Swiss-Prot record:
Pfam families for the chain: CobD_Cbib
Job of this protein: Converts cobyric acid to cobinamide by the addition of aminopropanol on the F carboxylic group.
Family: Belongs to the CobD/CbiB family.
Gene name of the encoded protein: cobD
Protein's cellular compartments: Cell membrane
PANTHER family: COBALAMIN BIOSYNTHESIS PROTEIN CBIB
A Gene Ontology term for the protein's cellular component: plasma membrane
Keywords linked to the UniProt accession: Cell membrane, Cobalamin biosynthesis, Membrane, Transmembrane, Transmembrane helix
NCBIfam families: cobal_cbiB, PRK01209.2-5
Protein name: Probable cobalamin biosynthesis protein CobD
Protein's membrane topology: Multi-pass membrane protein
Length: 304
């Protein structure tokens, strides 16, 4: 398991995201589009939305789990296939790739391009955001992405192996597709949103330590971090933890217009702060892996 994890991280660093035609996030999106219409055309939207979510997970998982099973007859092939599939469950370099485009646009004074690039990684409307608001949204995305895109999949990898990490990734994708509180998705996407809340609950709270620790390592941390003061301002019971911790660690005033303000007395975020947040992200990724994931994988190996 440790070799598979290290290999998966190496694949991410060297090659980045796999091609779309083998990526489970893309495949789950295609599955969703194929079957969604059928499940939405029913009165009991909560029940059928739940069945839809389970169906997407099962259908998406079949070819990947089958690939693992078939490859298991040859150890070397099994390890390589497992590395590739585990890699698809988390993202390290992809976050940097997306955020880099926003940073470069802001540095060049091209706020219109920055809004477009930001819109690819956030749910909010970016069309009228100013530079501070773009910076805030990017930093919030980095903080949340640490949990959704890395900590949670590997948390489940520790205890449930590749299937656990894989399902966690698809649940996160389902939440991003239909876990909204608008009229169309409030009932239909409720189960997807609930599953996403459950799987991220512990990793989100662990992020308090790893973001704070990483800010200390980088000599960024401004003050004692107390995210509890702000987490109640978020609709999500999980998102407030990494975002508030990042805001306090870097002493930034992060704001989603009309929704919440975190660390009210902090500085307005800038392009430089986006870069600092990415530094925290990378250190948090590797410290989480070394301090938390690897020791528990070793412990699980001895217990099982």
């Amino acid at each position: 398991m440790i070799i598979i994890l290290i290999g998966a991280i190496a694949i991410d660093i060297i090659f980045g995201e796999p091609k779309e035609y083998i990526h489970p996030v893309v495949f789950s999106g295609k599955v969703s589009k194929r079957i969604e219409t059928y499940f939405r055309h029913h009165d009991n939207r909560i029940v059928y939305g739940s069945i839809f979510a389970v169906a997407v997970i099962v259908i998406t998982a079949i070819p990947y789990f089958l690939a693992i099973y078939v490859s298991s007859f040859v150890l070397v092939i099994y390890v390589i296939v497992s590395m590739v599939i585990l890699k698809t469950t988390f993202s390290i370099s992809a976050m940097g790739d997306h955020i880099r485009l926003v940073v470069e646009s802001l540095k060049n004074g091209n706020i219109s391009d920055a809004r477009v690039y930001l819109s690819r990684v956030v749910r909010r409307d970016t069309s009228n955001l100013n530079e501070n608001e773009i910076s805030s949204a990017a930093i919030e995305t980095i903080a949340e992405g640490l949990v959704d895109g890395y900590m949670t999949p590997l948390f489940f990898f520790i205890f449930l192996g590749i299937p656990g990490a894989f399902v966690a990734r698809i649940i996160n994708t389902l939440d991003s597709m239909c876990g909204y509180k608008d009229r169309e998705n409030f009932e239909f996407g409720r189960f997807s949103a609930f599953m996403d809340t459950v799987i991220n609950y512990i990793p989100a709270r662990l992020s308090w330590f790893f973001i704070g620790f990483s800010a200390d390592v980088l000599n960024y941390r401004h003050k004692v971090i107390s995210p509890r003061k702000y987490v109640s301002r978020f609709d999500s019971v999980n998102a407030g933890w990494p975002i508030s911790t990042m805001a306090c660690a870097l002493n930034l005033r992060l704001e989603k217009r009309g929704s919440y303000i975190v660390n009210d007395e902090g500085y307005q975020p800038s392009v430089r702060d986006i870069e600092r947040s990415m530094h925290v992200f990378y250190v948090a990724v590797y410290s989480y892996t070394i301090i938390f994931v690897l020791p528990l994988l070793v412990a699980m190996a001895f217990l099982l």
